Amino acid sequence: MKKIVTATIATAGLATIAFAGHDAQAAEQNNNGYNSNDAQSYSYTYTIDAQGNYHYTWTGNWNPSQLTQNNTYYYNNYNTYSYNNASYNNYYNHSYQYNNYTNNSQTATNNYYTGGSGASYSTTSNNVHVTTTAAPSSNGRSISNGYASGSNLYTSGQCTYYVFDRVGGKIGSTWGNASNWASAAASSGYTVNNTPKAGAIMQTTQGYYGHVAYVEGVNSNGSVRVSEMNYGHGAGVVTSRTISANQAGSYNFIH
């Protein structure tokens, strides 16, 4: 069974994905989706609402009861699809695309990764490597000596919402998506560099919306402990991880 996958992600966090499948012979005749002359051909679309509920629309000779329940879908430019002991991985990094194929069956779970989950998520490591441009730098205001800017205007459940509250609201409430935070912070007078420090905000432009986390502390070996929301466990879920010193140098830090 060969599958063709097309994914579209809405800016509001609502995801729509379309799948089409048919056998290898049919694929040679029709590579564009559902074929009414193919007994195994089908296509379907589904949307995911704000509560993470799936809503399906089906066309063809298949039905939802046949959908494999151990598929994992990752959004924000990192997609993994596991079907019939075959795993297809697509990594998107700006304008570059890398496709890997392996015949090894992999265990997968139903996890929903929504906007703001930064760098490529790994199920085998708590460390993530990203590459960012040189951090802009400015001086004047600081998180430690700042004052609350007002109400939290970021989307509830997202990484930006959590970090704003975690720093006591002592940053701008209209900096936009996490990918924009470093430049917005520098423009507002905060110092932005690649040096981690307890109480700082870790930021990356990786992912569809970028990602931000709160720096809880820096260990003696240079590794960085962060807490964050909506990273690998869905909107509204706060988790923590430790990032190696080498990898931490690839992030921006807002002070």
Curated annotation (Swiss-Prot):
Domain Peptidase C51: 134-255
Sequence repeats: 75-78, 88-91, 98-101
Subcellular location: Secreted
Family matches, as Pfam families: CHAP
Keyword NAD (UniProt): no
Cited InterPro entries: CHAP_dom (IPR007921), Papain-like_cys_pep_sf (IPR038765)
Gene3D superfamilies associated with the record: endopeptidase domain like (from Nostoc punctiforme) (3.90.1720.10)
Domain of life: Bacteria
3 X 4 AA repeats of Y-N-N-Y as annotated region, ranges: 75-101
GO CC terms of this entry: extracellular region
Signal peptide (UniProt feature, chain positions): 1-26
Signal recorded as keyword: yes
Keywords recorded for this protein, A-Z: Repeat, Secreted, Signal, Virulence
Function summary: Not known; immunogenic protein.
Protein name in the entry: Staphylococcal secretory antigen ssaA1
